[in-house]
């Protein structure tokens, strides 16, 4: 599939403006199929100051999205892998849809699963946060929701993976980011194929095997204000 996802409104000239504004047409009947999502975001901090950002919740899902959005809109983004039906033309729609899936999954609670570890060889302390939707039949959301990002998704499997470093404004040190996204249109669950978590583990080897790997990785802390910040960015 070479053609990019087309914006719903002919008045918009770019995918960027589709993501920066709210385009929700309530009167027009929906004809889209449901979208399934497998999504994993891993954030690692190594310096004391960056560890504190994650521990205190100063770093929100919305701020991470804003950093990723600004990064991958560059055609030559380092560490970005596009495969299957994801193209440079539709990659920002895929990113936005994946984050909307996270919001729908957790509804009013966006959670980071946090754990602090110590390297057995170097003794280095690192702090890791993960956001995860582990099975695409849990990542459903209604078609009208993803119309807010200004596009409709043709049938296919959209994969977007990114390994990079984000540095907050005014800071010298950064955060290591690994994101893996698979969107399926229409939804494809375990009934007709293997869970998408199996495919994700093959692509991102350091994630634990299985579709719910975070149960033993530490306390889940609600990040309610992430929701409003992320919505402000998307809309």
Curated annotation (Swiss-Prot):
It is found in: Virion membrane; Host endomembrane system. One of its GO terms (molecular function) is structural constituent of virion. It is a peripheral membrane protein. Pfam families: VMR2. Keywords: Apoptosis, Host membrane, Membrane, Viral envelope protein, Viral matrix protein, Virion. InterPro entries: Viral_M (IPR031454). The keyword Coiled coil does not apply. GO terms for cellular component: host cell endomembrane system; membrane; viral envelope; virion membrane. Its main location: virion. The keyword Membrane applies. It comes from the Viruses. Most abundant protein in the virion. Plays a major role in assembly and budding of virion. Completely covers the ribonucleoprotein coil and keep it in condensed bullet-shaped form. Inhibits viral transcription and stimulates replication. Homomultimer. Interacts with nucleoprotein and with the cytoplasmic domain of glycoprotein. Belongs to the nucleorhabdovirus type-2 matrix protein family. This is Matrix protein.
């Amino acid at each position: 599939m070479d053609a990019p996802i087309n914006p719903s409104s002919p008045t918009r000239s770019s995918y960027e403006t589709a993501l920066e504004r709210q385009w929700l047409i309530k009167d027009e009947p929906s004809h889209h199929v449901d979208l399934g999502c497998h999504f994993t975001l891993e954030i690692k901090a190594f310096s004391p100051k960056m560890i504190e950002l994650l521990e205190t919740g100063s770093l929100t899902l919305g701020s991470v999205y804003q950093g990723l959005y600004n990064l991958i809109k560059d055609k030559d983004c380092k560490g970005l892998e596009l495969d299957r039906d994801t193209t440079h033309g539709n990659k920002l729609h895929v990113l936005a849809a994946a984050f909307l899936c996270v919001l729908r999954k957790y509804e009013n609670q966006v959670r980071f699963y946090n754990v602090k570890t110590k390297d057995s060889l170097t003794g280095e302390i690192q702090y890791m946060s993960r956001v995860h939707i582990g099975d695409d039949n849990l990542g459903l959301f209604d078609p009208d929701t993803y119309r807010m990002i200004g596009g409709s998704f043709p049938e296919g499997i959209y994969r977007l993976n990114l390994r990079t470093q984000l540095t907050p404004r005014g800071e010298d040190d950064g955060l290591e980011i690994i994101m893996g996204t698979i969107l399926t249109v229409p939804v494809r669950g375990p009934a007709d194929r293997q869970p998408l978590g199996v495919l994700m583990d093959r692509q991102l080897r350091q994630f634990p095997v299985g579709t719910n790997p975070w149960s033993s990785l530490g306390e889940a802390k609600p990040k309610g204000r992430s929701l409003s910040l992320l919505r402000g960015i998307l809309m």
